[in-house]
Amino acid sequence: MSSVMETPHAGKLKKYEFTPIGYAEEKRKEGIDLLKENGLKRSLESGSDLPAERKRVRNPSVVDETFSSTRLFNDTSFDETVPEGIIQERRPNSRKNLVDDLLIKDQETTENLTSNPLKETESSLKKLQMENYNLRIKCTSLLKFLNNISDDGEIVKNLEILDELDDLKVRYRQLNLDYTALQKQCDRIEDQNDEHEDIAKLKESNDKLKEELRSTKENLIDTDAQLQQLKDTIKSLENKIFNMRTEQTEKECQHGMQVDLLQSKINETSTSLTSKERECSDLKEKIKWLTSQLQEFDHQSGSLLDLQSTLDSKNEAIRNLEAQLQRNEHQRQSLEREVSLLQEELSSIRETHQKIITHKDQQIKQLTENLSSSDSEAVKRLNELSSERLRLLETNKSLKFSEKDLKQTVKSLEDQLNSCQEELHASQDKHKEKVSELLRKQLPYTSSEVEAMRQELLEMRKSNDILKTENNSLSRRLDNLIRQSPSKKSVEVDIQRKNNEIRALRSTVKDLEHELQDVTSNVSKLKENHKEEIQKLRKQVNPDLPTDVLEEKSKLQNRISLLQMELNSIKDTKEKELAMWRRKYETIRRSNEELLQEGKDQSGQLSNILNEKDKEILQLQSRFNSLLTEKNSLLNELSKVRSHKDDYKEELKKNQSRLEFITKEFVKLKDASKQAENSEDAKDILNNKWYSKYQSMKDKFLGELKSLQDENLELQKSLLKQKANPNSTAEVFSKTTEKGTLKDEIDYYRLKYANEVKQNNDLKTMNQYLNRVLRASSQHVKLDILKLQNEVPVYNPYADIPFHNMRFSHQKIKFKTVALLVLSCIRMKTTIEARRWDRQRLDYLKRKIVLNQDNISW
């Protein structure tokens, strides 16, 4: 036969009566005890389990058993050492054997809860811990009774004190014997010394010697103190001498360094001065060459005059063309004004003509209407009007022709204007080309030389400024070094010599500048003289030329000089702009290079960060693997714990039997001590027995103490290692947290499973209840229909029943209905609370597992 699959806890389902709300009353054969135990079990089941589970979930790592431990200690501190019969007399309601009851309960729970092995193992582990604790308490109580040990468990101290007491007793006896022997010897010596007469003298001499000894000791102490002081002073003086020597050596090194620096700087200044002298000589040579070039330029200025004359002629032609252009523009503007006036007149004439035509048409119509009255007059009038009309049409045609002529004249004028403008543009272009050619021809002779001169002057000024700044900085440094250096006089002499040289150089530079100014003034004077001589020669060559021509030539020359000046200024501005753009380009290039460098640095930093992150990922992976291995090991340990459960039970049984044996022996010893209270021999025998037992216990405890001390040392070493290696502590913490999370996950899934089982059971019961209600209601409806069919008469089609005679039974509410309602409300409240608590616990565990935070409480 195939077994039907059922959900766990299916046996807990209750049998319901056909009642509207609530549980069914249990059968009478189950008894009153079953009703007490199972009456509200299903509704309060989850609520009763809540506190224990809540405590365990709040603090999973540490099991707090303070209340149970104090209770057990109070119960079994002294009573456990007394035989069982006496304990039962004192406490008739107490249990005989705690371990047996615990084992039986454990077996019952394992039989009942086969579907939840995790809970079973946890409960068994808790019970084993409790049993172990009880056994420890019993052992401590026995030790207290036997050896009068304190509550703190100070076993070793008491044993050591007892050993010391025995040793002290033995020593006391020996000392007493030695003291008696010494007393006897002293008595003998005194008896012998009474015979001698020189005892007083010996005593006096002995006292003097003692005083001398004391004085010598005091003197020795004083001399030792003085010696110590002298040694300290010598040490301090030696330290001071050593420090002074080190400072002196350091100062000597610093002075040597400063002297070397000064010598190097003096050498640098001498080299720079020689280089400057060379530069000055080069500049003089350049000035001479420039003067020669200027003279050559003055000789070549004759060819420029022809060019200037051609330029003047072209300029005059351009001016004439510009004047013609202006005239043409004025004519065009006047013609445009006339055209606009004519157009206005034409429009006004057209309007008047239209008005006249309309008026005449109206008159013709009137005349045609009045033909019958005045035909002859009308015909005449008509002829006149038609003649007038023809005349007006001819005038209109003539006006149109005049308008066309005006338009043609305007077009011709515009064409002339455009041609003039084109000629002007062409002449301007030619003029520009000729000017540019002239400038190009003059440029290699003038601009290059002038620019070279300017650049050389600028360089000279810059070098002079740099020399001044260097001289100032050198003088400041030299002053500072002279103030600090020990060899002051020699350095001052050197500085004065250098200053004199610098002054001489400055004077030479000033002389050179004056010479340059004189040369420039001479060049300008020579140019003026040259011009005057050229003018005189021209006058001599052609004296017939009028003064006006000469004045115009001078004007042209002045204009050429102005143009050259403008050209030079344009070139200067161009050069400045080029320099500015070059600076901007250099700044942009530098910024670009800096940005590229920053980008490279950032990329390097990012690559370093990436490498670090990769290393961290590898470390985390290794840690994850280690945690997985630890998890597997923990799971193996858990399986081992489950397997060793039976072994623990057997060990508990053995410990229990041993405890019973110890209590029996204790009872026997107590009986023997009561029987042998009177006889001294029996007391000695008992004392010997106790002493032998004491010795055996002492040896055992000492062995245990040694083992515990070794363990303590090992633990201390491991603790020190853990402090040295913080990674190990982190691993331990991770292990503990992993255990905590494992426990939380187990609790979470166990709770969820229990809730789902309860829900399924509730749904089953509801389904059964509703099916029963439907069946019963259908049966009642069928019966009611049959009754109605039988009761309603056939002859009365409208069922005319006298309703006023019917009695309606107003029954009172029974106590049973009220009680059932109250019971249902209470049960609803308890179920809602249990449901809410379960939901809260599930949410708490879920958050704790997801966030991995043990600090969260609910």
Curated annotation (Swiss-Prot):
Highest taxon in the source lineage: Eukaryota
- Sorted alphabetically, which keywords does the UniProt record give? Coiled coil, Cytoplasm, Cytoskeleton, Nucleus
Q: Which residues form a coiled coil?
A: 118-725
Q: What is its main location?
A: nucleus
Record's Pfam families?
Spc110_C (PF18520)
Subcellular location field = Nucleus; Cytoplasm, Cytoskeleton, Microtubule organizing center, Spindle pole body
Task: Tell me which GO cellular component terms the UniProt record holds.
Answer: cytoplasm; nucleus; spindle pole body
Q: Does this entry carry the keyword Cytoplasm?
A: yes
The record describes its quaternary structure and partners as:
Homodimer.
Q: Which family does it belong to?
A: Belongs to the SPC110 family.
Tell me, in a sentence or two, what this protein's role is.
Answer: Component of the spindle pole body (SPB) required for the proper execution of spindle pole body (SPB) duplication. Potential role in cross-linking filaments or anchoring other molecules. It is essential for growth.
Q: Mind telling me what this protein is named? A: Spindle pole body component 110
Query: What is the organism field in this record?
Result: Kluyveromyces lactis (strain ATCC 8585 / CBS 2359 / DSM 70799 / NBRC 1267 / NRRL Y-1140 / WM37)
